[in-house]
């Protein structure tokens, strides 16, 4: 186990390089094939079986211990209360910048966790569904702040998380379309008492100043049983973001119904410049102000290199 130079002796994290972390796999079986992985890839990020074996299988093993421990604690609580134990999902929060690979991480984890021996039901929810509609953002002058905390319907997200964590059935999740860059009015996904919920979002580790006891403020992270932050250097994420926009420009943006179809009238150089501008003026600002400052609230940090591979893992010890 190595020590990161810039972290002092009272760091709350244990740090592991790739080889050290991979050793924690032990005898956890690899349940994914190359064919399975093909369905899980991101727009620009390719996850190899080697990455799954060395990084995600040990993480899956760790989570299996954590979920079991949480279930035992929950059983003890309801035994003490003398009440029947409800079915309450284990909630995992995955945070990080735009284009850092949160969705790919969520998909790989879902695939692995759902293949545990007891075959748990795993659902992935993204906070995109809780963005205000473009019409409302336009009215409030927030279109250029899309993805910032104020662009989300936080009361609705908190109500949904409370319902899920209370064991309610058939909880409705609003649907967001990246193709139309907007909420799909009247369309919902249903979450019906899964065993595990993965919540993926930009600002989900963010907190503020809590109010008085009479006005106790609740944060998204209050509902998490485990939280994970996907990290990389800002200049590296910028390149990934530009590459992703160019990839969409060559494919989905060609659809006349796509919100960004107008970009297909530009050259590749112009689109790259557009993406860089959006990164610098919006996404980087959000990262520095609302995402990165809360990285150390996560229980586990995955640190990526420029080739998308995870090179270091930080596990909270306290």
Curated annotation (Swiss-Prot):
CDD domains: PanK. Disulfide bonds: none annotated. It is found in: Cytoplasm. It catalyses: (R)-pantothenate + ATP = (R)-4'-phosphopantothenate + ADP + H(+). GO terms for molecular function: ATP binding; pantothenate kinase activity. One of its GO terms (cellular component) is cytoplasm. The keyword Translocase does not apply. The keyword Phosphoprotein does not apply. Its EC number is 2.7.1.33. InterPro entries: P-loop_NTPase, PanK, PRK/URK. Its main location: cytoplasm. Pathway: Cofactor biosynthesis; coenzyme A biosynthesis; CoA from (R)-pantothenate: step 1/5. ATP binds at residues 96-103. GO terms for biological process: coenzyme A biosynthetic process. Keywords: ATP-binding, Coenzyme A biosynthesis, Cytoplasm, Kinase, Nucleotide-binding, Transferase. It holds the Pfam family PRK. Belongs to the prokaryotic pantothenate kinase family. This is Pantothenate kinase. It comes from Coxiella burnetii (strain RSA 331 / Henzerling II).
């Amino acid at each position: 186990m190595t020590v990161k130079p810039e972290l002092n002796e009272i760091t709350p994290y244990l740090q592991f390089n790739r080889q050290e972390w991979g050793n924690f796999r032990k005898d956890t079986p690899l349940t994914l094939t190359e064919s399975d992985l093909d369905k899980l890839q991101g727009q620009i990020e390719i996850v190899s079986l080697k990455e799954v074996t060395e990084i995600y299988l040990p993480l899956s093993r760790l989570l299996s211990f954590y979920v079991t421990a949480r279930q035992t604690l929950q059983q003890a609580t309801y035994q003490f209360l003398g009440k029947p134990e409800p079915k309450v999902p284990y909630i995992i929060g995955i945070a990080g910048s735009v284009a850092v690979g949160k969705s790919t991480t969520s998909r790989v984890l879902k695939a692995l966790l759902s293949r545990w021996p007891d075959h748990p039901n795993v659902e992935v929810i993204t906070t995109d569904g809780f963005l205000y509609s473009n019409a409302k953002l336009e009215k409030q002058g927030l279109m250029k702040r899309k993805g910032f905390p104020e662009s989300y319907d936080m009361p609705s997200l908190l109500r949904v998380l409370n319902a899920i964590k209370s064991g309610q059935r058939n909880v409705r999740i609003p649907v967001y379309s990246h193709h139309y860059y907007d909420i799909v009015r009247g369309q919902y996904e249903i979450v019906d008492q899964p065993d595990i919920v993965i919540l993926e979002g930009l600002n989900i580790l963010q907190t503020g100043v809590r109010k008085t006891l009479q006005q106790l403020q609740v944060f998204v992270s209050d509902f998490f049983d485990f939280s994970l932050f996907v990290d990389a250097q800002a200049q590296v994420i910028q390149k990934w973001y530009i590459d992703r926009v160019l990839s969409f420009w060559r494919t989905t943006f060609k659809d006349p119904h796509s919100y960004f179809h107008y970009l297909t009238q530009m050259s590749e150089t112009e689109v790259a410049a557009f993406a860089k501008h959006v990164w610098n003026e919006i996404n980087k600002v959000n990262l520095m102000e609302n995402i990165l400052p809360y990285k150390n609230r996560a229980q586990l940090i995955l640190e990526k290199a420029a080739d998308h591979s995870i090179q270091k893992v930080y596990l909270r010890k306290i």
